[in-house]
Amino acid sequence: MSYKPIAPAPSSTPGSSTPGPGTPVPTGSVPSPSGSVPGAGAPFRPLFNDFGPPSMGYVQAMKPPGAQGSQSTYTDLLSVIEEMGKEIRPTYAGSKSAMERLKRGIIHARALVRECLAETERNART
């Protein structure tokens, strides 16, 4: 394999509309984080939601009308535990993002366990 030098970046010509790498960009023309045209009024929306339990990378299925609450909660718990199992090895290898996903999964699993226990107690009373 031979070494090939990196070609220099193309410089902008005086008539071009795109600034070169060394040209300062005026602050009024910096694009918004949402990718819209500046001043268009489209608000910035993050790609994730901080409210509620984490999704752990899977989409929760819609519950059918006749489904029992405890069965679907138990199924959700099993899928969360399965997803958490995939994060163990990367966490040991030092992955910070896997560690954060594992933490969120533990929090989500604890909430689901509480739901399952509450459902069991309700069923025991009847």
UniProtKB/Swiss-Prot annotation:
What is the protein's quaternary organization? Component of the nucleosome remodeling and deacetylase (NuRD) repressor complex, composed of core proteins MTA1, MTA2, MTA3, RBBP4, RBBP7, HDAC1, HDAC2, MBD2, MBD3, and peripherally associated proteins CDK2AP1, CDK2AP2, GATAD2A, GATAD2B, CHD3, CHD4 and CHD5. The exact stoichiometry of the NuRD complex is unknown, and some subunits such as MBD2 and MBD3, GATAD2A and GATAD2B, and CHD3, CHD4 and CHD5 define mutually exclusive NuRD complexes. Interacts with CDK2AP1. Interacts with CDK2. Interacts with MAPK1.
Q: Is Signal found in the keyword set? A: no
What is this protein called in UniProt?
Answer: Cyclin-dependent kinase 2-associated protein 2
Q: Tissue expression, per UniProt?
A: Ubiquitous.
Q: PTM details? A: Phosphorylated by MAPK1 and CDK2.
Q: Which InterPro entries match?
A: DOC_1/2 (IPR017266)
Q: Spell out the GO cellular component terms annotated for this protein, sorted alphabetically and separated by semicolons.
A: cytoplasm; microtubule; nucleus; NuRD complex
The similarity comment for this entry is: Belongs to the CDK2AP family.
Region entry Interaction with CDK2, spans = 64-106
From the record, give the cysteines joined by S-S bonds. Answer: none
Q: Which Pfam families match?
A: CDK2AP (PF09806)
Name the residue ranges with Low complexity bias. 9-43
Annotated region described as Disordered, given as residue ranges: 1-48
Q: Where in the cell is it found?
A: Cytoplasm; Nucleus
Q: Which domain of life is it from?
A: Eukaryota
- GO terms (BP aspect): negative regulation of G1/S transition of mitotic cell cycle; regulation of microtubule cytoskeleton organization; regulation of stem cell division
Function according to Swiss-Prot or TrEMBL: Acts as a component of the histone deacetylase NuRD complex which participates in the remodeling of chromatin. Inhibits cell cycle G1/S phase transition by repressing CDK2 expression and activation; represses CDK2 activation by inhibiting its interaction with cyclin E and A. Plays a role in regulating the self-renewal of embryonic stem cells (ESCs) and in maintaining cell survival during terminal differentiation of ESCs. Regulates microtubule organization of metaphase II oocytes.
Sorted alphabetically, the keyword list is: Cytoplasm, Nucleus, Phosphoprotein
